[in-house]
Amino acid sequence: MGPDNRRVLLATVLSLGIITLWQLSPWGRAPKPAPKPAQQASQPAKPAETAAPSAPTPAPQAQPAPAPVPVNAPEELITLEGSGFRVVLTSHGGALREVHLEGQKFRRDTGGGQLEPINLVRVTEGQPYPLAVVASPELGGAQDAATDPAARAPMRLVAHDEHSATFEGRAGNATVRKVFRLTGRPYELGLDLEVSGAAAANAGVIVLYPGFMPPATKSGGFFSGPPVEFMRPICRAGQSTERFDVNGKEQMARGEGAVQWAGLDQGYFISALFPSEPKGACAFARGPVAGSGETAIRLPMEGDAARYSLSVYLGPKDLDLLRAYGRGFDSAIDYGTMARPFAFFARLLLYVMRWFERLVHNWGVAIILLTVLVKVLLYPLTAKSMQSMNEMRKLQPEIEKLKAKHGNDREKLNLATMQLYQQHKVNPLGGCLPMLLQLPIWFALYATLQTSVELYREPFLWIADLTRKDPYYILPLAMGVSSFVMQKLSPQPADNSQAKMMLYFMPAFFTFIMLSVPAGLTLYIFVNNVLSIVQQQVMMRRMPPAAPGSAASASPPTVSARPAKR
C-alpha cells in the first residue's frame, strides 16, 4: 500500500469514527430489540438465581372491607418533603401525582427563560398515576389493567403527617391499604402495601408504573441535537436488565425471572420500584397513545391477604447512589449498543473528571484538565509521532522531485515514495498513532456526557449545559479552524488531490458533525487540537535541522517498471 493510500486509509478510519459517534446518539442509534413477547397464558415467575431463600411473609389477618368511596369523590392531595425531592400523592388511585426534584441543577426550561423543578411523573389521558394497584389473575392482563377504572378509583385518606400518608380503598374485588412514608434516604419513598380479598379470584396483584413522553420533547432534526427527554419502561428480572421500546412493533412483552426492580428510565433520571426481596414478574406494555407505556409488576398472593414492603427510588441516575442499592441497579445507566465496549473507559473518565471538579468546581475546566492529563500520558507516543512528521517534512523536496519525474504515473510514484521512506527509515503512519488512540476516549466521553447526570445542566462560559450542543456553534467552528491549522502544519501527501481532501474536506466534514454533538466533547477535541499545535511547534523548534544535503543530496530512488505478476 502506497503512502498516499495510507493517508486515504487514515481519513477513512477517522470518518468511520465520526460516523460511529453519530450512531451513538439517540437520533442515530438503532432501537434495541424488544424483550420476549408476552404469552397470553399466565406463567409462574422464575426465582432469582442469587436471591437467598427466605420464609414467606406472614399474611395479615383479613380486615373488614372499608366502605366504598364514591366514584365522584373529590381529589385529595398530600405533599411529602423528602431528601432531595418532593412528592405529591393523590387519593385517585392512592398514587403518585407529582415528583419534583430539588436544587437549581434539576430545573427545566419551560419557555421564556422560566425554570421549574423537574417533574418525573408524566402520564397522558387514560393512564393511571404511578404506583396504582389492580387485582389481576395473570400478568398478561397488565395492558388491560392499565386502562382498568379500578387503577384510578378514588381511595380514602385515613391518616397523614409530614412524613407519611395512608390510603384505603378497593381495587376491583380486592381491599387495598397503602402507606407511603419517607425513609430519609436520598430520593427514596417507602411503600407498605396490604391487599386482601383477591386470592380466591385473582391470586395476584399488579402494581403499575406508567409513563408518557410528550411528542414536543422529541428531536426536531439534526441541528436540534438529541432529545432532552425520553422514556423507556425498564425491569431488572433475574440477572438481566431489559428495556421496552414504546414506539416499537410489540404491544406487550414480559421479563424473565424474579423482579429485582422495575420502573421507567427517563434519560438522566429513573423511577424504580424495589420489592423487599426479588419476587414476582414484570411486563411492559404500550400505552393508549403514541409515546406512552407502562411497566407492571405482578406480586403473588399467599393466602387471602398479603403484605408487601417496597422501596421506590425517584431521582437522578447518580452512579454512587445506584450502586448503594445493589441488585444491579447501576445497570440502569445504559451506554448504548455501540458505546458499550467503552463503558469501562466512560466510568474511568467520569471518576477522573469528578476528582478534577472537586478541585476547580467547574465541569468545563475539569474537561480541560482531563485533556491536559491525556496529552501528558500520550507524550512519549506524541514525541515519536512529531519526530516522524519532522523526518517526512525533510523529505518533501525529494517527494516533489519524484512527482515531477513520474508525473501522472501513480503506481511508479507510490513505489518510489515508499522506497524513499524506507531509505530514510521513515514511517508515514507514525504521525497517526496519537490521533487513533484518541478515538476510544472520544467515544467514552460522548457516552459519559449522554448518560452521566453529574454533567447534566453544568455550565461553562457561554454554554448553559455541557451535555447539549453549543447553542451559538462557537466551539464547533473553533474546533474546525484548529483542525485546519493542524492539517496545514502536517506534511502533505504526494498526491495533490489527497492533500486538498485532508486539508479542506476533513476539517469541514468534522465541523459539520460536531455542530450537534454535546459541547463537552467538542471542548475536549478543541483543547486537544490547540495543545497538539503548541506541542508540535515547540518540539519542531527543538529538533535539529536537517543536515545540508542529507535528503536533498541523496539520489532519488530509481524505479524501474516491473512486469505484472501473473
Which residues does each PLM region occupy?
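Mixed-charge, polar/low-complexity N-terminal
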Residues: 1, 60-62, 66-69, 244, ...
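Helix-loop-helix
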Residues: 1-39, 89, 191-194, 215-227, ...
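Intrinsically disordered, low-complexity sequence elements enriched in Ser/Thr/Gly/Pro
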Residues: 4-5, 44, 84, 150, ...
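Juxtamembrane extramembrane loops of integral membrane proteins
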Residues: 24-120, 167, 171, 556-566
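Generic low-polarity alpha-helical segments
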Residues: 68-73, 80, 187, 534, ...
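Preference for short coil/turn "hinge" residues that link or interrupt alpha-helices
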Residues: 73, 111, 173-175, 257, ...
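Soluble non-transmembrane domains of integral membrane proteins
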Residues: 77, 81-333
